[in-house]
Amino acid sequence: PTLCCNLSCSYCYLGKQTTEAALKLDAQRAVQTLRHTLDALKAAGVLAFNVSLHGGEVTTLPPPVLDALFTMIRAHYLEHFDAHNALGHKKSAPHIKTNLFKFAPLYELFDRHKVSISASIDLPLSLHARHRTTRGGTDWLPRTLDNIRLLARYPHAKKISATLSSEHLADIPALVHDIWYLHRELGFDMNQFNLMFAFGSELNRAAKGEAVLTPCTPAQQQALYDALTAEFMGTELEEGLKRNWFDEFKPSYCTNAPNCGERFYLLQSDGAVYSCVR
């Protein structure tokens, strides 16, 4: 619903769009854009089986706008419950991608709508402090950890995702250590975890210049997989390793083909449509 974001991540593929986005305008039109789209899909005989809110950062929108979006999405799932169920789709609540910066003040709203949460962090956590800062360049890692503790107690669907660049894989033992830390010390079930790899972006380079991070090499990705397999096979996180951690690289999620249009498309608040969120 908006490209605006309250962070300035080193690897953000949206570049300066996150600071130039017209948040006030997005807030005014997001609800109507979604309403128009769901109505148009229904009129065309197309069943929207997964309505997720992405960004930018969704939680930069005012709470009343979020409330209206969540209400509409829940009503959509309820209206089409039987059709979704017959096709094997189990969604019944809104889903958002969030950096957790405003998770605590919005907790009650999320809880009321049973919102499914996908929270983005950096691993190792030391790089979260360096590469996932506020727009003013401030480290907010302690607040992140507090919000992960809160997320661990959140009673609805949730997961954590981490975007990895070459710099993130320079110290794989630290990354492994922090997975255990989140799981054992902060109490978040790290079976519910996704790995993603940063990719090159001209918008990112234009915004960050020489500070841009480097995509992982195939050798680094293989080294990561080998280390995770050696560490977590035979532990309480084996299921996550086998089922979820690399889920976004499986054909059921992503075809890894340009403009495939097979599963998802991106709808902007101004009504513009793209074939993929990436």
Annotated model-derived regions:
Residues 1-96, 101-105, 113:
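Conserved alpha-helical substructure of the radical SAM core
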Residues 71, 108-116, 136, 177-184:
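Short, surface-exposed basic-aromatic patches at helix termini and helix-loop junctions that form
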Residues 4-5, 120, 144:
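Active-site cores of enzymes that catalyze phosphoryl transfer or operate on phosphate-rich substrates
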Residues 106, 110-125, 191-200:
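Non-cysteine beta-strand/loop elements that form the S-adenosyl-L-methionine
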Residues 126-145, 149-261, 266-270:
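Radical SAM enzyme [4Fe-4S]-AdoMet core and its adjacent flexible, acidic
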Residues 276-278:
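Short beta->alpha transition motifs characteristic of CBS
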Residues 49-53, 94-96, 117-119, 158-162, ...:
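Hydrophobic faces of well-ordered beta-strands that scaffold small-molecule active sites
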